[in-house]
Amino acid sequence: MSKLKTRKSAAKRFKATATGKFMRRRAFHNHLLDHKSSKLKRHLSTKAVVDERDADNVRLMIPYA
């Protein structure tokens, strides 16, 4: 059986943890940041865990993570 291909776009967006979960960046922290509070921007700069309902799709896109 041939090797599975990794979707490079997903590999750049998600990182696997040691327990098999995936981490992602939060949205709304790219531009138009002037009116957002420092507290909100600090929160948006942290990583989030991919929801378990989406984790299976991410796992298919990154088979060797």
Curated annotation (Swiss-Prot):
<keyword id="KW-0687">Ribonucleoprotein</keyword>
<dbReference type="InterPro" id="IPR018265">
    <property type="entry name" value="Ribosomal_bL35_CS"/>
</dbReference>
<dbReference type="InterPro" id="IPR001706">
    <property type="entry name" value="Ribosomal_bL35"/>
</dbReference>
<protein>
    <recommendedName>
        <fullName>Large ribosomal subunit protein bL35</fullName>
    </recommendedName>
</protein>
<dbReference type="Pfam" id="PF01632">
    <property type="entry name" value="Ribosomal_L35p"/>
</dbReference>
<dbReference type="GO" id="GO:0022625">
    <property type="term" value="C:cytosolic large ribosomal subunit"/>
</dbReference>
<dbReference type="InterPro" id="IPR021137">
    <property type="entry name" value="Ribosomal_bL35-like"/>
</dbReference>
<keyword id="KW-0689">Ribosomal protein</keyword>
<dbReference type="InterPro" id="IPR037229">
    <property type="entry name" value="Ribosomal_bL35_sf"/>
</dbReference>
<dbReference type="GO" id="GO:0006412">
    <property type="term" value="P:translation"/>
</dbReference>
<comment type="similarity">
    <text>Belongs to the bacterial ribosomal protein bL35 family.</text>
</comment>
<dbReference type="GO" id="GO:0003735">
    <property type="term" value="F:structural constituent of ribosome"/>
</dbReference>
